[in-house]
C-alpha cells in the first residue's frame, strides 16, 4: 500500500527510547572525571579590558582556570569556517577564524571569556564567581538593516559593511526580463522585502561533551551527541595540532539534532 502525506508511519527506533533504554552522553560515567564551566560575556559587543583569574585559581578543588591568552600560549588553533561559497561577483568568500574564547573583543552576548576545570560542577561554578572581568561596552546592532547601514559598527575588519557573503542562487537577468515583459502589458508590479527571522533549533539535549586521554599515549577520546563525528574529529585535531587518527569521537544516542549537531 502506498503511503500518502499525513499517513502515520511505523517507527522502529522509538520503543527502546520510550522504555528509558537510550544511552545519551549524560548516561556515560566518566569515573573521576572533572567538570568544566564557562564565564560568558554579558555584552553583545565589547572590549575585554581586564581579566583577573588568580582568586579562582586559588580555590580548593580547581584544577585549571584559563583564558584565550593561555590557549594562545599553548598554540591552540582558532576555529575556521568549514563553508566554501562564492559571492555574486564570482569571488571566494572571505573566511574569518574564531578563537575558542574572547581575544580582546567579544562579538556576541555569551562569548566565552574564561573556563574553569574543577572537581565538580559546584566548585567550578563557585570559581566563576571569583573571576573579575571588566569590559568597555561598544556599539551594537540587532537587525540586518542596521548592520549594513552607513556608519554601523564593524564586527570584523575583513567584512566591509558587515557583509560576510553576497550569495545569489537565482537567474536575476531572466527574472528581470520576465517582469519587464509583464510591465509592457500595463500590469503593475509589486516589490516586497522579505527578511527571515533568526531561527535557532533547540533540542532537548544540548551539546555536551566528555573528553579524556585515549588508550594510547597522546591520543584523545571524546563522547558527544553529534551527527558528524568525522568532522568533529577533524576540527579538533586541527586546533589541537594532533593527527586526526589520534582523535576518536564516539556518538551515543543523539537527543535531537535537526542538522545543527
What are these regions (language model features)?
Residues 1-160:
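Flexible, low-hydrophobicity surface segments
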Residues 61, 65, 173-182:
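Predominantly extracellular/luminal regions of secreted and cell-surface proteins
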Residues 68, 246-252:
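Beta-strand segments within the central parallel beta-sheet cores of soluble alpha/beta enzyme folds
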Residues 179-240:
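Conserved beta-alpha junction segments in alpha/beta enzyme cores
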Residues 259-261:
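Short glycine/threonine-rich loop-to-helix capping motif typified by GTGT followed
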Amino acid at each position: 500500500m502506498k503511503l500518502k502525506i499525513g499517513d502515520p508511519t511505523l517507527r522502529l527506533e522509538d520503543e527502546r527510547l520510550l522504555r528509558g533504554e537510550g544511552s545519551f552522553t549524560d548516561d556515560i560515567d566518566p569515573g573521576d572525571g572533572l567538570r568544566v564551566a564557562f564565564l560568558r560575556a554579558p555584552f553583545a559587543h565589547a572590549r575585554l579590558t581586564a581579566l583577573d583569574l588568580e582568586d579562582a585559581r586559588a580555590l580548593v578543588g580547581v584544577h585549571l582556570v584559563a583564558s584565550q591568552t593561555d590557549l594562545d600560549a599553548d598554540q591552540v588553533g582558532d576555529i575556521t569556517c568549514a563553508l566554501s561559497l562564492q559571492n555574486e561577483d564570482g569571488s571566494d568568500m572571505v573566511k574569518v577564524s574564531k578563537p575558542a574564547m574572547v581575544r580582546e573583543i567579544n562579538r556576541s552576548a555569551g562569548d566565552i571569556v574564561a573556563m574553569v576545570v574543577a572537581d565538580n560542577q559546584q566548585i567550578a561554578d563557585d570559581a566563576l564567581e571569583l573571576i573579575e572581568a571588566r569590559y568597555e561596552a561598544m556599539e551594537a546592532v540587532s537587525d540586518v538593516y542596521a548592520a549594513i547601514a552607513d556608519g554601523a559598527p564593524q564586527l570584523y575588519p575583513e567584512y566591509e559593511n558587515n557583509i560576510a557573503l553576497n550569495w545569489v542562487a537565482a537567474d536575476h537577468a531572466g527574472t528581470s526580463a520576465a517582469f519587464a515583459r509583464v510591465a509592457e502589458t500595463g500590469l503593475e508590479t509589486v516589490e516586497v522585502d522579505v527578511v527571515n527571522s533568526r531561527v535557532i533549533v533547540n533540542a532537548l539535549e544540548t551539546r555536551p561533551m566528555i573528553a579524556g586521554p585515549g588508550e594510547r599515549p597522546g591520543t584523545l577520546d571524546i563522547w558527544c551527541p553529534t551527527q558528524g563525528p568525522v568532522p568533529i574529529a577533524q576540527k579538533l585535531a586541527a586546533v589541537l595540532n594532533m593527527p586526526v587518527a589520534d582523535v576518536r569521537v564516539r556518538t551515543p544516542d543523539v537527543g535531537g539534532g535537526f542538522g545543527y549537531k
